Every structure is written in structure tokens, then in C-alpha cells.
């Protein structure tokens, strides 16, 4: 049986931590920034850890060799 391929789009958007959690960048920072306060924009910086179920789905369906 051949190796499973990792989805390229998911590979670019998510990272796995050493403990197996899935990390993604914050959503909602591409446009419509004028209507947001400076504090809201500042809070969108950096990354966030996905909830358990979302992380499980990413690892199971899109990252076949991620820790399950």
C-alpha cells in the first residue's frame, strides 16, 4: 500500500506541537481592519491552539502521519 499524502494546504496553515496539539494562526486579520479597535487588532497577532475536536479532525483526515 502506498504512503498517504499530506494535504498541502493544511501543511501550510497548521503546525503540530511536541505534545500533539494543533497550532494555527488567528483568523480574521486579512481585511476590514478599519472597523476594529487597536486592541482587537493586537489580540489577533500570533497563534492559537485549536480545540481538541478540531485538532483531532485535522490530524486524522489531513495530516495522516501526525500523532493520533
Curated annotation (Swiss-Prot):
InterPro entries: Ribosomal_bL35, Ribosomal_bL35-like, Ribosomal_bL35_CS, Ribosomal_bL35_sf. Belongs to the bacterial ribosomal protein bL35 family. GO terms for cellular component: cytosolic large ribosomal subunit. GO terms for molecular function: structural constituent of ribosome. Pfam families: Ribosomal_L35p (PF01632). GO terms for biological process: translation. Keywords: Ribonucleoprotein, Ribosomal protein. It comes from the Bacteria. This is Large ribosomal subunit protein bL35. Gene3D superfamilies: 4.10.410.60. It comes from Rickettsia bellii (strain OSU 85-389).
Amino acid at each position: 500500500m502506498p504512503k498517504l499524502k499530506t494535504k498541502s494546504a493544511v501543511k501550510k496553515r497548521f503546525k503540530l506541537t511536541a505534545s500533539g496539539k494543533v497550532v494555527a494562526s488567528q483568523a480574521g486579520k486579512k481585511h476590514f481592519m478599519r472597523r476594529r479597535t487597536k486592541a482587537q487588532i493586537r489580540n489577533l497577532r500570533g497563534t492559537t491552539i485549536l480545540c481538541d475536536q478540531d485538532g483531532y479532525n485535522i490530524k486524522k483526515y489531513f495530516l495522516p502521519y501526525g500523532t493520533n
